[in-house]
Amino acid sequence: MDDHIRFDHQTFELHLLDQRLLPAQEADFVCRSVEDVVYALQTMVVRGAPAIGVTAAWGCVLALREAQGPDWAARLEQGMERIAAARPTAVNLRWAVERMRGVWLAAGGEAGDPAPLLTAFAHAAQTMQDEDVAVCKTLGRHGAACIEDGDCVLTHCNAGALATAGYGTALGVIRAAVEAGKKVSVIADETRPFLQGARLTAWELERDGIPVTVACDNACALLMSRGLVQRVVVGADRIAANGDTANKIGTYGVALLARHFHIPFYVAAPLSTIDPATPDGAGIPIEERPELEVTHMGETRLCPENVPVLNFAFDVTPAEYISGIITEKGVLYPPYGLSIWAALNDLSTGRSAGISAGPLRDEDDAPDAEPDWSRERS
């Protein structure tokens, strides 16, 4: 799947596979303006941190295209900020806009010529999209070493090709394990209220021929207690400098259950999802979404009128519950403050920095003696 984010250079239109309609219908949502991109981001036409970032980059191309006249620089800045503020939790959104801003500054900033800048913007956005696919495949190969032949992997939400420019993060790990010849099956929990697991993860894996079963969110404890889950792999929307991880609401509960049942819990995310400016999870903004997502199923209202609704889109899993963070640089292990810093600064890729190209097998080798949860399973 490599055409769910597609920019038409002839018409200057951004085509996004409308994920709200899956799996019943495959149709594109076409963005012709900054406001179209913001709408697509906010209504989850497109979702998933890396995919949001790539969409934002192409949105900046549209912002520049709209910014005509003597005040083009001010209008471009306004459009880019509008995109960057569309959703608060996924750090890739701001990261992508700032990367495009760097292209602008390199071309002379406000003193530059907007005509050649448009070509530079389009090239930068395409480069970002291509890089994300390559990063996901590299990340997947590192993460595949964490999956054993015969494992059943539980995943939450959708961190697959749809959530990235292609291949996926959590699902990229599963895809890479299957490509390496391992027999892997998946339990996709439904992920209320937007049902990304039931609608999107199951759709992706079924198309790939990877065995997948959908389970209710509240069945997780039972599944683990019966030994039906050997690994958990999830994606991330923002990772703090200490390893605390924001992901789809419900992830924290899955992590707590995994710890209780001694099941390894991995986060798979590119380094662009790490926010070194946020020391810990307390500083990660948590998006609240419309009540309608909870109160209605399609056009049918499920809840009584006038009953308040809480619809937090994300929660934060403390780093202490994460067995490893799978990145394109390798698998990061505790202490995450050190291993994240080393990975971001392109320093050691050795175990002394808490980074490994595969899972640590000996507890004595693990930085700060991260437990090997698989050894404690009964």
UniProtKB/Swiss-Prot annotation:
Site (Transition state stabilizer): 157
InterPro entries given in the database record: IF-2B-related, IF-M1Pi, IF_2B-like_C, Initiation_fac_2B_a/b/d, M1Pi_N, NagB/RpiA_transferase-like
One GO term of the biological process aspect: L-methionine salvage from methylthioadenosine
Any one Gene Ontology molecular-function term assigned to this protein's record: S-methyl-5-thioribose-1-phosphate isomerase activity
EC main group: isomerase
Catalytic activity reported: 5-(methylsulfanyl)-alpha-D-ribose 1-phosphate = 5-(methylsulfanyl)-D-ribulose 1-phosphate
Biased composition, class Acidic residues, residue ranges: 362-371
Metabolic or biological pathway: Amino-acid biosynthesis; L-methionine biosynthesis via salvage pathway; L-methionine from S-methyl-5-thio-alpha-D-ribose 1-phosphate: step 1/6
Keywords for this protein: Amino-acid biosynthesis, Isomerase, Methionine biosynthesis
EC number: 5.3.1.23
Region: Disordered, residue numbers: 354-378
Residue sites binding substrate per the record: 47-49, 87, 196, 247-248
Active site as annotated: 237
Its biological purpose: Catalyzes the interconversion of methylthioribose-1-phosphate (MTR-1-P) into methylthioribulose-1-phosphate (MTRu-1-P).
HAMAP family the record matches: Salvage_MtnA
Family listed: Belongs to the eIF-2B alpha/beta/delta subunits family. MtnA subfamily.
Name used for this protein in its record: Methylthioribose-1-phosphate isomerase
